[in-house]
Amino acid sequence: MHTGKFSRWVFEAIHRGNHGLFIQILDMKLRVSCNLRFHIVEASALILMLRPFRGIQQWINRDVYTIKPAIPMIESTDSFGNSCQRLVAPVGDFLIHTSAEVMVPDKVDVTPRAYFVEIQHLPNEVLTFLLPSRYCESDRFGDLAREITFDSLPGYDQVSKINDWVRNSIQYLPGSSEFPLSAVEVHHLGHGVCRDLAQVAIALCRSISIPARLVVGYLHNLQPMDLHAWFEAYIGDRWYTFDPTQSVLRGGRVIIAFGRDAEDVSIFHQFGSGCLLNNMDVRVDLLDNSPIVIL
């Protein structure tokens, strides 16, 4: 067991599950960066969500956040534990640079026998991910979810079936939508971006009483490179990763934020009409590394 600077992550990992020790191996070191260029017509308030999430899922070795021109910025944490930044952008060109070196798992845990957790046994903080939300109208998907999962074991197998159904039924078209669409709208259209496919899967999971949440972050070797969205489902007393845009579930994921849907995990909210995003550049590079084992 690591000591010193790793002790907080060790403590959290031990207490994460209700049924024994949970071991997290962080064996991939990535450098991630996001550069945003805005043109500000009139001073505009922004709430940003660009720092990587701090938790046992990943270990942040280095974190850089630069804004030009330099102005005051307020840091806070939202109700889901995501890091938020609040500022008022001045008139003119406004640049934001964020980068981090992060240790993450090279592989995603796959546990086909992970069991369904009955609602009365769910942790309180998980309950909110059972309910319909703005972009995940789970109350509209019950019949379809039961049709998709009718021959599946309760739990992981149901979520895996839902993930496969979304990947095969909703066409993944990167860059096809600029604004968030609801799960009902995406199901009707039959195509969408990563966020859209994840939200359809979330709505389906919640409709059969499996908590599910949206994740936004970086994915190594994503083509075309951009920020990415996937989802997690709560089964077997922990969160498991799923991604309907990928035929093979893989690791190399750096998490920025979790939430109920796109409303909670937008990388920036602008207030007023005087803020234009002219360019966004995202990079994910693999670095030399030594694995970290967290017990």
Each language-model region and where it sits:
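Short, surface-exposed linear segments at secondary-structure transitions and domain or protein termini
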Residues: 71-73, 119-122, 249-258
